[in-house]
Structures are given as C-alpha cells and as structure tokens.
C-alpha cells in the first residue's frame, strides 16, 4: 500500500497525469455543443480538431466557421503548451517535460472526457513541443501554416509541419543553442520527437492513403 501511495504522490506521475487531463480538454467538442448544439464526434471524420470543426460548420453554412475553427486550433495548441509550461514552472527534469508533452498529446487524441475519443493531435503536438525545441517547432509551425494556406490540405500541412520539426532535431542541436532547449544535450537522444512523428503518421494513415490516391479533400 505504501508503494502505491508513493507512486501516486510522485510529482512526475502527478504532472504526467495532469498533462494527460489538460490535453484531454475537448475544446472543439465543447464549443460546438455550446454554440451550435452539434456533436462534432458524430460529424465528418469524428475528430474534435479545427479541421473537422471547420468542415462541419461550413456544411451548415455558418458564417463564422473559419473564426471558430481558428479558435479551436489556438486553444488546442495552447493546452499543450500550458501543460509543458507547468512542468517547467515546477522544475521537472527536461526529459520528464517530454513525458508531460506526450501525455498531453495522448490526452487530446484519447480524451478521458469523451470515452477516449478525440482528434489527431497536431495542434497539441506543436503547442507542447514549442517550449522544448522552440527553433525546430517554430519552423515546423511556419511550414504547417504555409502549406495549409497555399495548398489547403490540412493533413499534408500537419504531416509536413511535424515532419519538419522532427528532421530539424537532427541538425539544430549541433548549433550554438542553449542546453536548456537542446534535446540531444538534455535527453541524449531525438527519440521523443521521432516517436511523436511516427504517432502523427499513424493517426493520419487514412489521409496518407487518400493523398496517394488523389482523394484527400481540401479545406476551403
């Protein structure tokens, strides 16, 4: 019993669970329910992220569809950032901050508030890692927004955005950057971000098939 109590009161466990719960806040679902009386999990792809929110609202002719989708994107991004910010604020080790980041991503994709359903996690991914690898993340965010704006294919923008940040972790750590944001110096491996990218590919498996067969829908 003492071992269980020690485990449950361990600050690392507490913050990992907290990260999962914060990431699990279903902003897209909540806003759609409150303002439009719609269950986003039963519309389109069933995802709770900005893309499905946009498509659902546009299909109903809602005039502020893009503004609502942008709000969902920002909130999903900031919840990941907030989870990691808290772990930094309370002095958790850098490697454990990555655990909190991953927990927040899993929380978004498998929300405990929606029977473990959720979204594909890209907004939360970019938000959670921006405080850990800011240079790589900001470039990845730029690629994400640029591809999304120009090509209007959300899945491709997401994959390229996270992919860019992942590729850069094999180059940026060798530059003259502070150790506090150097994944190679602090963790000794790029594995956490690589795993996040693999997870992104898995979550977008259907989209990748559609991209390869020319069936992927654009976001208008």
UniProtKB/Swiss-Prot annotation:
BP GO annotations: phospholipid biosynthetic process
**What's the protein's topology in the membrane?**
Multi-pass membrane protein
Q: Which residues cross the membrane?
A: 11-31, 70-90, 96-116, 127-147, 153-173, 192-212
Q: Which SMART domains does this entry report, sorted A to Z?
A: G3P_acyltransf
Pathway involvement of the protein, from the record: Lipid metabolism; phospholipid metabolism
Compartment(s) where it occurs, according to its Swiss-Prot or TrEMBL record: Cell inner membrane
Where it mainly occurs, coarsely classed, is membrane
Q: Return the EC number.
A: 2.3.1.275
* Keyword terms, alphabetized: Cell inner membrane, Cell membrane, Lipid biosynthesis, Lipid metabolism, Membrane, Phospholipid biosynthesis, Phospholipid metabolism, Transferase, Transmembrane, Transmembrane helix
Q: Which domain of life is it from?
A: Bacteria
Top EC class for this record: transferase
Any single Gene Ontology cellular-component annotation: plasma membrane
Q: Which reaction does it catalyse?
A: an acyl phosphate + sn-glycerol 3-phosphate = a 1-acyl-sn-glycero-3-phosphate + phosphate
Give the UniProt family note. Answer: Belongs to the PlsY family.
The record's annotation in PANTHER family points to:
GLYCEROL-3-PHOSPHATE ACYLTRANSFERASE-RELATED, INNER MEMBRANE PROTEIN YGIH
Q: How does it assemble?
A: Probably interacts with PlsX.
Specify the protein name. Answer: Glycerol-3-phosphate acyltransferase
| Organism per entry | Helicobacter pylori (strain J99 / ATCC 700824)
């Amino acid at each position: 019993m003492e071992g269980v109590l020690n485990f449950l009161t361990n600050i690392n466990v507490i913050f990992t669970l907290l990260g999962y719960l914060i990431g699990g806040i279903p902003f897209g679902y909540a806003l759609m329910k409150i303002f439009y009386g719609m269950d986003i999990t039963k519309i389109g792809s069933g995802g709770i992220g900005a893309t499905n929110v946009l498509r659902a609202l546009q299909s109903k002719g809602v005039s502020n569809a893009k503004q609502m989708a942008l709000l969902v994107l920002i909130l999903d991004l900031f919840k990941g950032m907030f989870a990691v910010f808290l772990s930094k604020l309370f002095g958790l080790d850098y490697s454990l901050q990555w655990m909190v980041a991953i927990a927040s991503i899993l929380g978004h994709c498998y929300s405990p508030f929606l029977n473990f359903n959720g979204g594909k996690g890209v907004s939360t991914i970019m938000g959670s890692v921006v405080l850990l690898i800011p240079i790589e993340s900001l470039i990845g965010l730029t690629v994400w927004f640029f591809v999304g704006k120009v090509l209007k294919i959300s899945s491709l923008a997401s994959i390229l955005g996270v992919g860019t940040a992942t590729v850069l972790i094999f180059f940026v750590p060798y530059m003259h950057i502070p150790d506090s944001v150097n994944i190679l110096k602090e963790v000794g491996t790029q594995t956490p971000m690589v795993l996040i990218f693999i997870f992104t590919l898995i979550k977008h498996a259907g989209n990748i098939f559609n991209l390869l067969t020319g069936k992927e829908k654009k976001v208008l």
